[in-house]
Amino acid sequence: VHCLKYGLTTNNLLGIEMVTMDGEILRLGGKHLDAGDYDLMGVMTGSEGLLGVVSEVTLRILQKPATQRALLVGFDDTGSAGKAVGDVIAAGIIPAGMEMMDGLAINAAEDFANAGYPRGAAALIIVELDGPEVEVDVLIEHVEAIMRAAGASSVKISKSEEERNLFWAGRKSAFPAVGRISPDYLCMDGTIPRRRLPD
């Protein structure tokens, strides 16, 4: 969820020690993110254990943001929601996390988690903003204005950490929730260029 702002796992690895399938111990990476060699750590991370067993990692540690708040934004159509995602990024705002769900996932997740999702919405976007409290307050105003300009039918802003977690609990339960409706459900990660989301 937070890879938009903070990167993927591989972006936060400084080094790994791993054991290859033939028993060789390899040390990859170092103490700096910008090592000039091939991205072997990226290859190993992407292989998810197929090329060896990782026995030690050196990670980049980030300080927890002072404030984290989320917006739960409903739309009457997925095209407007897709456009809103691009509009937020085009405005120079990089949310800590941003996820979009369609109507089927919204209702399945709401049945499963009671997260307070708008049942009549055709699409839902969860936007998380983090940083100093004053900055987050300003960003929330900007993001809400962008969402409304893109056609948002509802906007709910988390008032507490518990409510923010509840917004995300619904999203995180979407896969098992849809699985209850269709046990043979197949989930695949896809990549869509932001400019094509409205399509």
Locations of the language-model features?
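C-terminal substrate-recognition/cap domain of FAD-linked oxidoreductases
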Residues: 59-63, 69-199
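FAD-binding subdomain of flavoenzyme oxidoreductases
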Residues: 1-99
